[in-house]
Amino acid sequence: VISPFTDSIKSQYSNKNKIWKDPRILPDFELLTIKHQHSPGIDKPSQYSSWVEMIESIKNQMSSLDYDIVLIGTGASALPLIAHAKRSGKKGIHLGGPLQLLFGIKGGRWDNGPIGKHFYNEYWIRPSIGETPEKFKNIEGGCYW
C-alpha cells in the first residue's frame, strides 16, 4: 500500500474484521507499506529535492519488496508508480482518496454522506496527528482528514 497515511493504515489493519462486517472487503494479506509525501502545498520540506526524486525513491522501494498487487492512494503520482508495477510484472490499482476508507480511516469528504452514515463505527479513526500537516485544510478543505 502506498499512501501518506501508512501509520494509520498499519494500525487499522488489525481491526479489519471490526471495521467491515464482510471479511471479503479487507481480506487477510501481508500488509507492506510505503509512505508517500503529501502535496507540496501543505507538507513540510521533505528529504527529496523534487517530486521526480521522490517518485524514483518510491519505485526503488517497490522494487525491493516482494508483492503481487500494490494499492495506491497518492493522486497524480500514482500513474508512474502503477506503470512501474506493471513493468515489474505486478498489478497496480489506484484507488485515490478512497483508499483510506478501505482501512477504516475517516475523512471529511465522507462524514455526512452514505459512507459515513452507513459504514463508520467505533473502530474507524481519523488520520494520525503525525499524518495531519499543519496546512491540511489547503487540500480541498481538508477532505481527507
Question: Model segments located where?
Answer:
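Secondary-structure boundary elements
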Residues: 23-29, 60-68, 87-91
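C-terminal functional extensions of proteins
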Residues: 80-88, 92-145
